[in-house]
From Swiss-Prot:
PROSITE patterns according to UniProt: RIBOSOMAL_S10
UniProt cross-references to InterPro entries, sorted A to Z: Ribosomal_uS10, Ribosomal_uS10_CS, Ribosomal_uS10_dom, Ribosomal_uS10_dom_sf
Annotated function: Involved in the binding of tRNA to the ribosomes.
Full protein name: Small ribosomal subunit protein uS10
GO biological process, one term: translation
Amino acid sequence: MEKIRLKLRAYDHRVLDRSVSAIVEAVKRTGAEIRGPIPLPTKIRRYTVLRSPHINKDSREQFEIRIHSRLIDIVSATPDTVDSLMKLDLAPEVDVEVRSMGE
């Protein structure tokens, strides 16, 4: 059929890894060839906020959010593979981006 690329993102790497392993299991059961999961670089967003609402500019607090991501390529996807991916119940914290890559 065609090549499907899945890009998964989450703030918690443990939840992300559980979702990735569920996807890999489902795809392997259908007999499709899979490449990955490939860990992509973690994006770190840092925010600096004043601690006091009025004075003390020198007193600041820093927060950060880490966004972990993985990439999975399904090389020979069949209609069975697509059906099993649609039926998967993944964690709500995981953002899944699906792209169809032409042959």
